């Protein structure tokens, strides 16, 4: 078992990475005999892993209840949040309860926000079951639900007590979801670690085939990078915003199409290309670097052009609604070079449109 520790000012917790962790009672520390637990999952994940997790927790001596939410980004809503609160109240859960998020990013985000809010805060543990959740959304305490007018607009920073990453759960993950997770993996390389980007270029085929050792190394490196950034900037006042490379463009695609039409990682893939093209326009990246990024995304079976029918000017209203807008200025995460992300307000609207147009289908 590999472990990465997240060390924050007022909180620290382990990320445990390995095979067969769901059946190992030691993985679930700090849970112990007598603890009350509410597992939050969805029917897709529950059919594979709910019984395993529940039985292991019962073996530890926990009292376990479960609640299943509808599956998909379009259910990251007040209604799903309220469903968790209702289950907690109906089953008489108090402040000493622990929520366990068993699922992908949607389950993790909604469960985390429920944990932050229920009786002003209860403990929760992340068991991410998608690659994207394992390397990104389960780490760092960002919890949220969507609003019809914007993604992740209602939420809280609330850290888990532990993150349990069992790489075996990826064997039941749809190939499209594996690719979507690899978009965020590639983001870590291109934005923070050029050596890791080169390693990804060499190992993308093994990752697509879910080779266990390659996966474990990849997940560990992503977790190390994320943990280091979160430790510097827990509530996204500065450095942490760099993790949003490609996301301002990508969120525009998601919001325009309707959440859940394209997967988050698919939207981010195109968003990274558009941000990289803008970086090139501003005199930073080379055409060769842009081509390498495009090739790596294509090898991960990710889209490399905007959705059919979406024009460049349709991005702008969503981009202006982005949480990184400050004092009426659009703050974009761009690249000085591979591994060197930075934030700028210098790009003009015309430059942004030109960058997007390169990756729109005419």
UniProtKB/Swiss-Prot annotation:
Gene3D superfamilies: 3.40.50.1970, Dehydroquinate synthase-like - alpha domain (1.20.1090.10)
Binding site for NAD(+): 71-76, 105-109, 129-130, 142, 151
Keyword match Iron: no
Annotated InterPro entries: Dehydroquinate_synthase (IPR050071), DHQ_synth_AroB (IPR016037), DHQ_synth_fam (IPR030963), DHQS/DOIS_N (IPR030960), DHQS_C (IPR056179)
Alphabetized GO MF terms: 3-dehydroquinate synthase activity; metal ion binding; nucleotide binding
Reactions catalysed, as given in the entry: 7-phospho-2-dehydro-3-deoxy-D-arabino-heptonate = 3-dehydroquinate + phosphate
A single Gene Ontology CC term: cytoplasm
Keywords: Amino-acid biosynthesis, Aromatic amino acid biosynthesis, Cobalt, Cytoplasm, Lyase, Metal-binding, NAD, Nucleotide-binding, Zinc
Keyword Lipoprotein assigned: no
Residue numbers binding Zn(2+): 184, 247, 264
A Pfam family it matches: DHQ_synthase
Coiled coil: none
Family annotation (SUPFAM superfamilies): Dehydroquinate synthase-like
EC main group: lyase
Cofactor note: Binds 1 divalent metal cation per subunit. Can use either Co(2+) or Zn(2+).
Pathway named in the protein's UniProt entry: Metabolic intermediate biosynthesis; chorismate biosynthesis; chorismate from D-erythrose 4-phosphate and phosphoenolpyruvate: step 2/7
EC number: 4.2.3.4
Function: Catalyzes the conversion of 3-deoxy-D-arabino-heptulosonate 7-phosphate (DAHP) to dehydroquinate (DHQ).
Annotated family: Belongs to the sugar phosphate cyclases superfamily. Dehydroquinate synthase family.
Name listed for the protein in its UniProt record: 3-dehydroquinate synthase
């Amino acid at each position: 078992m590999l472990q990465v520790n997240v060390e924050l000012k007022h909180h620290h917790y382990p990320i445990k990475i390995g095979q067969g962790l769901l059946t190992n009672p030691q993985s679930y520390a700090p849970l112990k005999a007598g603890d009350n637990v509410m597992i939050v999952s969805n029917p897709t994940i529950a059919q594979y892993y709910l019984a395993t997790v529940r039985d292991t927790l019962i073996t530890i001596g926990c009292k376990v209840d479960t609640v299943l939410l509808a599956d998909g980004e379009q259910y990251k809503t007040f209604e799903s949040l309220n469903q968790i609160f209702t289950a907690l109240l109906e089953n008489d859960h108090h402040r000493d309860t622990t929520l366990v998020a068993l699922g992908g990013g949607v389950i993790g985000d909604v469960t985390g926000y429920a944990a932050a809010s229920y009786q002003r805060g209860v403990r929760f543990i992340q068991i991410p079951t998608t690659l994207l959740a394992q390397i990104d959304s389960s780490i760092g305490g960002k919890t949220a639900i969507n609003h019809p007018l914007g993604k992740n607009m209602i939420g809280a920073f609330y850290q888990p007590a532990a993150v349990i990453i069992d790489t075996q759960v990826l064997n039941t993950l749809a190939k499209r979801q594996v690719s979507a997770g690899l978009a965020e993996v590639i983001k870590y390389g291109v934005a923070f670690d050029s050596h890791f980007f080169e390693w990804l270029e060499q190992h993308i085929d093994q990752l697509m085939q879910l080779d266990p050792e390659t996966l474990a190394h990849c997940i560990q490196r992503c977790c190390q990078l994320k943990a280091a950034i979160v430790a510097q900037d827990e509530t996204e006042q500065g450095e942490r915003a760099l993790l949003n490379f490609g996301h301002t463009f990508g969120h525009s695609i998601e919001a325009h199409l309707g959440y859940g039409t394209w997967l988050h990682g698919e939207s981010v893939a195109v968003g990274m290309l558009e941000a990289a093209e803008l970086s090139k326009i501003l005199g930073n990246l080379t055409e060769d670097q842009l081509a390498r990024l495009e090739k790596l995304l294509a090898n991960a079976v990710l889209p490399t052009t905007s959705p059919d029918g979406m024009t460049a000017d349709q991005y702008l209203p969503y981009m202006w609604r982005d949480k990184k807008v400050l004092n009426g200025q659009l703050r974009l995460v761009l690249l000085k070079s591979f591994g060197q992300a930075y934030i700028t307000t210098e790009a003009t609207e015309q430059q942004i449109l030109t960058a997007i147009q390169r990756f729109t289908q005419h």
